[in-house]
Every structure is written in structure tokens, then in C-alpha cells.
Regions:
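Domain-scale selection of a single, long terminal region
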Residues: 1-5, 145
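Glycine-centered structural positions embedded in regular secondary structure
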Residues: 4, 135, 139, 185-186
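A short, structure-level motif marking secondary-structure boundaries and short turns
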Residues: 9-10, 129-131, 187
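A glycine-rich helix N-cap at a beta->alpha junction
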Residues: 172-188
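Short, small-residue-rich loop/turn micro-motifs
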Residues: 17, 121-125, 187
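Small-aliphatic-rich amphipathic alpha-helix that forms the alpha element of a beta-alpha
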Residues: 31, 50, 76, 117-170
């Protein structure tokens, strides 16, 4: 996954980079889907930047993506060959959920089963009673991942082919939490 040693513990990520990068219009122009990924891993800085862009805090109690009524019902989990982690945006930290390679549960396609990183976007429907609102938020989260990947010269693709029940079990989700989308991310 990253340049750090992976163990069955939480990982404090470095402060996300909030300035610089590719100009927005250039990132939009470069945005694309790709199903080709090397086995090279992202650095902790890249993970921090991507997850902050996905659903981090950019001002007090407000996220980088809009959430209807500011319910903030969405979470991001990362799935690596070594473990599953939940992103804790207030602390910019990865919370260890479980060890082991669970990528086969998160993907029906071979390219995603072998990719070094999958990002699962999860809605807690107890916080947001309208699934359509959660869908709006997950769309914004996914788009931020696409734009960040374009800015970094990385590949990504959004996927809806996954084992919902297997993922819920592997990620230890509650009854009210549901995976809405999975996005594979990696180097070319």
C-alpha cells in the first residue's frame, strides 16, 4: 500500500497538501477512466491528499464535498493487499478495520482484484434518510478522486460491480451502512 510498515494498527497520515497542483481546467481535461494499474503503491502523502480531496475537512465542520443538510453521512474506506482501513477525516488518520487481502470481495473484475488500492465509498443511511442525497455526495466524492488522480498522473475507474454483503462483512459495517461505489486507484 504505502511507504510505511503496515501492521494491525492505525496510521497517522501526513498533513494533506492543500495548495498547488495542476490547474483545475487542466485536471478536468485530463480526467479519464482506466483499468490499467501497476502494482506500485501510493505514498502516505498521496493517500492523505487523495482522501482529503475525497471527504476531508476544508473548514470547520464542513467537508470538501457537499452533503445534503450537512448530514455528512459518507465515509471512505481503503482496501489494500494487506488490510482494510477507514479514513477518519477529522484526524486525517487511517483506522485499521481488519488485516488480510480482501480485494476479491471488493471486485468482480480481475484488474481491480489485482490493483494495489480500492476506495469504498460508504453511506450511513441512518444519518441520511434519502438515498438520493447520499448518491449526490458519493458522486462528488468520486469526481474529486478522478480530478485528484488526473492532477497526479494516476489511473482510476469507478465501479459498481462488487459483493455488497461480503464487503459489509469484511468492513464490519453496521446495518444502516451501505457501500454505494468502489473506485480503483493506482499508478500507470
Amino acid at each position: 500500500m504505502t511507504s510505511c510498515n503496515l501492521t494491525a494498527q492505525d496510521i497517522q497520515l501526513p498533513e494533506p497538501t492543500r495548495k498547488g497542483g495542476m490547474p483545475l481546467m487542466e485536471a478536468i481535461n485530463n480526467r479519464h477512466s482506466s483499468r490499467e494499474f501497476s502494482d506500485a503503491t501510493l505514498t502516505n502523502q498521496q493517500l492523505s491528499d487523495m482522501l482529503w480531496a475525497t471527504c476531508g475537512y476544508n473548514r470547520p465542520d464542513k467537508r470538501t464535498v457537499a452533503t445534503a443538510l450537512n448530514r455528512q453521512e459518507m465515509s471512505a474506506y481503503i482496501v489494500t493487499p494487506e488490510a482494510i482501513y477507514k479514513y477518519e477525516p477529522k484526524e486525517n488518520k487511517l483506522i485499521h478495520i481488519t488485516s488480510g487481502d480482501h480485494r476479491d470481495v471488493f471486485a468482480a473484475q480481475d484488474f481491480a482484484k489485482n490493483a494495489p488500492l480500492n476506495v469504498a465509498l460508504v453511506a450511513d443511511l441512518a444519518k441520511q434518510d434519502k438515498k438520493e442525497f447520499a448518491g449526490m455526495t458519493v458522486g462528488a466524492m468520486s469526481n474529486n478522486i478522478y480530478l485528484w488522480c488526473a492532477s497526479e498522473g494516476l489511473n482510476t475507474v469507478t465501479r459498481a460491480s462488487f459483493n455488497q454483503e461480503g464487503m459489509k462483512k469484511a468492513m464490519k459495517l453496521s446495518e444502516t451502512e451501505e457501500v454505494l461505489l468502489v473506485q480503483t486507484v493506482g499508478k500507470k
